């Protein structure tokens, strides 16, 4: 009996195609929102490296880049990413994403610094439908672009779930915005304050830096940096879960 390989091959291809198409029936996909005047990413693309790299500055660390790094590492793409702490532009250029250093804000190349003199972005300027006008730090920048994805991942829900928008707004208004304001030196009110708050997250993160008279080395600073990420990350996740269930 003559064996018709081509006939069998094409029958298998046809059967596979039907199953593939059937698997997508009933699926809902959220269309990209092009209504804003500026591009706000909701995902991230790596350079296809085996070990993704997140770049930030070395030296004294602050709450904004600590939280920015934590948020990025909660994305599936960056869960096992290595954090490179440097100001060397050659090394930063090798990173998949750079936060709080480099003097560039450009989401197209995943650069999220806010220190350049020209930077005046707020949540409202990037997403005009939102009311918040506090100048963004690297924490706010990363949150604006990737917060929805991280919330969906933490809550294990679909990216088009209405709950995400509610939590996204509440976490910024009642948590991230405070970090943005403190990092940028924006006072909580006009005029003289009756007292100072020194136990907020930004202060506690700052206190983890080695003091001026404390013996220090790269290993100790790295240990403190990781401890700070854990502290900031726990509070961020607590806020997400709190607003998701309130």
Question: Locations of the language-model features?
Answer:
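Intrinsic-disorder-associated interaction segments
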Residues: 6-9, 13, 165-168, 194, ...
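Glycine-rich, Lys/Arg-enriched anion-binding loops that position phosphate/diphosphate groups
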Residues: 182-246
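N-terminal mitochondrial targeting presequence
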Residues: 2-25
